[in-house]
């Protein structure tokens, strides 16, 4: 089959590789009908994610049709159309039972790698480095789905892929970002980053009862989408002082909750931005935490920071004094896929949400390299690139 | 005389002690989740024969006898005289608080011999026998909770194309 393999920073190649096979009784094989680049794939593309090996197949946001099931797959059958969670959970460990799917104890065969850097291993993720399990990704014609009964959710036929594809990863990630805010009546939620995850976080904040939502970015088309799709108010951080503007918009209180939908390659400004960029370039700091710092200062006293933007390693110059003395709550994590996916599928089927609006560009899988370049540099006002293997 | 090496490792498994105990008590099950233990053959109620494989198909073998057996709580075993390597081990099952399952603690002690067998064991267990026992226990947990051991052996990649 054809697959998109990583060979180093900014080096992805379409190659012919063997088809996947069932390796464990709870596996299924999926024919990928649609898959899309996630912002976190750019961290891999840019070479910031360790334990990648040349030849690894990328991709973790996808859907398709089940073509084969292992002996212990009970709920799914050949022919089922499914949306697949980017995060892999066994469904039987204590964490999965608590619905904390990304903390699964049993889905990461290379758990020991994470134990060394994080203290404990966490769940496997498709196409996201060997430390996260080394699972082959979805930028391929076929993919093996471990623990398929939980990792994949059956969806009806007759609704286009575009409307369901973001339910694999971007939508539940944004939804969890809002869910972690414990939104109360009257709450104002600010979201840093108006990419796909940020769009879904803003929209989800309203679904969960926010009074007002404010989106922060610098790209006009993304801010426009935040206004049109998520019905958010917007701030362009290149045009205004974000801290001042947020205070003015919230009666001086600051947003009740702040969501980070940006992550480790945040675009900082001024000397602070240069400092992080330089330190990250020579690997003295793995992540650029500009957004985190700003959220701590912006957030209402006693408010909540919800951190979804992916971080991998270390950050420095964190204003912990501000966080501590303002009594902030930090909540974060990789998304708990199967906890949210069925509910979000319902929202799509009911017509509450049309996630397809974030998918601005479609390419065949063979043009993956162009897709990455277009997405990375936001060419042609690109927000999200969808690949179709056929 | 070399010094004996003792390794202790604990994992919490979300299953009742009775289920974990009875799986472990059938020593033939152990090679299903241990990396180096190739075969355990039960000879009698409290005696079994254990085989470890090493590099170049070398093997280390011994007979072990059960020295303590408390159903659903503890199993302890010890190699009998004449073993390739003198060793002893135990596994203990203790309820974790608040319905968090069972804490499973493994203790192994062995006296590394010299010569060929000593070299082989050193290669097998490297500098971190704790890591090896920990990985074995992680696989035991996967098998008990998830019913299978997570793997990627045999999946596709473009690795074979990466050298051109």
Summary of predicted features, one role per range:
Chain B
Residues 48-55, 75-82, 106:
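Short beta-strand segments that buttress and anchor functional surface loops
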Residues 15, 54, 68, 95, ...:
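Non-catalytic surface loops within mature trypsin-like serine protease
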Residues 60, 78-137, 141-142, 146, ...:
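Beta-strand/loop substructures that line and gate deep hydrophobic ligand-binding cavities in soluble
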Residues 52-65, 69-72:
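Short hydrophobic interaction/assembly module
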Residues 43, 67-69, 92-98:
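Short beta-strand micro-motifs enriched in acidic
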Residues 4-10, 47, 61, 74, ...:
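Intrinsic-disorder/low-complexity, polar/charged segments enriched in Ser/Thr/Lys/Arg/Asp/Glu/Gln
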